[in-house]
Swiss-Prot record:
EC numbers for this chain: 3.1.3.16
Source taxon at top rank: Eukaryota
Catalysis performed (reactions): O-phospho-L-seryl-[protein] + H2O = L-seryl-[protein] + phosphate; O-phospho-L-threonyl-[protein] + H2O = L-threonyl-[protein] + phosphate
Family the UniProt entry places it in: Belongs to the metallophosphoesterase superfamily. CPPED1 family.
Enzyme class: hydrolase
Family matches, as InterPro entries: Calcineurin-like_PHP_ApaH (IPR004843), Metallo-depent_PP-like (IPR029052), MPP_CSTP1 (IPR041867), STPP_CPPED1 (IPR051918)
Cofactor annotation remark: Binds 2 divalent metal cations.
Residues reported to bind a divalent metal cation 2: 88, 125, 244
Protein name: Serine/threonine-protein phosphatase CPPED1
Keywords: Cytoplasm, Hydrolase, Metal-binding
Length: 311
């Protein structure tokens, strides 16, 4: 059990143990990773019956879909550098009776991911609560590893943030202060190192369609959003990958690509259950959303494969 448990606890000490910083801080050539979001075990039943608070007592559909996702990822060649899940791992909020069982079933599926593909976890509102507390954040960390951390892969700097602290930190102000100080220090590293690319993962999008859009449940509050965007631009962040919306969305803001990826689980729009493939080359970041069926059947597009061969 300890070996299986370790798969889910690689984010610790604000870093990620699968990648050695010294070995990974230099550019080595193009690579790719897989981004998924919102497997959210239990939401499909909840949504179907119109009880999103307490209706999530069944999650067979989400188990099957996540199994499809893992199967598709395991087939890919060459293998992705990692598989990141951008939050809402399960639907039950902290304190809801099915949470522990949902997490157990999700882990049973995810541990079938090929051992050479590390799993990176991002906390979402259903993982730590809409207004998280020190206790809900600690429970998440005990189960999935640190709620925020950074790591290097092939000369690219990755930041995993706890976006719920941007949304409502009223019950954990000290933890928000710690997160803010850490983020400022990481952005200073990104700016100083002038790394090949710097990329952020968080659950809640900064915005869905345009940077000055109105406040919404699915984005970050406008004045804070503008502050974060300016910080990210100054540090040279090239892309922010998120979930939360259960639909594909996003847009460019100056040089920053805000990417909103639809769900592995319940769809709230017209997208198919799917995953995003992200190719990182020396001069650009290229991404495409695939349905689970499409990725399982056909694998990567030749266009993306060709990008991986560029020098």
């Amino acid at each position: 059990m300890s070996e299986a448990r370790e798969v889910f606890l690689r984010a610790r000490g604000r870093s990620f143990t699968s990648f050695n910083k010294d070995a990974e801080s230099q550019w080595k050539g193009p690579f790719y990773f897989i981004q998924g979001a919102d497997p959210q075990f239990g939401l499909m039943k909840s949504w179907e019956i119109g009880d999103c608070d307490y209706g999530g007592d069944e999650w067979e559909q989400e188990i099957r879909l996540t199994e499809e996702a893992v199967k598709a990822i395991n087939k890919l060649s060459p293998k992705p550098k990692f598989f990141v899940l951008c939050g809402d791992l399960v639907h039950s909020m902290p304190g809801i009776e099915w949470k522990e069982e949902q997490e157990k079933d999700l882990k049973n599926v995810l541990q079938k991911t090929h051992q050479e593909i590390p799993l990176v976890f991002v906390s979402g509102n259903h993982d730590i609560g809409n207004a998280p507390t020190p206790e809900t954040i600690q429970a998440y960390c005990d189960s999935w590893g640190d709620d925020y951390f950074s790591f290097w892969v092939g000369g690219v700097f990755f930041l995993v943030l706890n976006s719920q602290l941007f949304f409502d930190a009223s019950k954990c102000p000290e933890l928000k202060d710690n997160h803010d100080r850490w983020l400022a220090a990481q952005l200073a590293i990104a700016e100083e190192r002038k790394c090949k690319h710097a990329i952020v993962f968080q659950h809640i999008p900064l915005f869905l369609q345009k940077a000055d859009e109105d406040n919404d449940y699915f984005n970050i509050e406008k004045s804070l959003r503008q502050e974060i965007l300016q910080m990210f631009l100054k540090a040279g962040i090239k892309a922010v990958f998120s979930g939360h919306y259960h639909r594909n969305a996003g847009a460019k803001y100056n040089d920053l690509d805000m990417v909103v990826t639809s769900a592995i689980g319940c769809q709230l729009g017209k997208d198919a259950h799917g995953l995003r493939v992200v190719v990182v080359t020396e001069d650009k970041i290229v991404h495409k959303y695939y349905s689970l069926n499409e990725l399982n059947t056909n694998g990567l597009d030749q266009e993306l494969v060709d990008l991986l061969k560029t020098k």
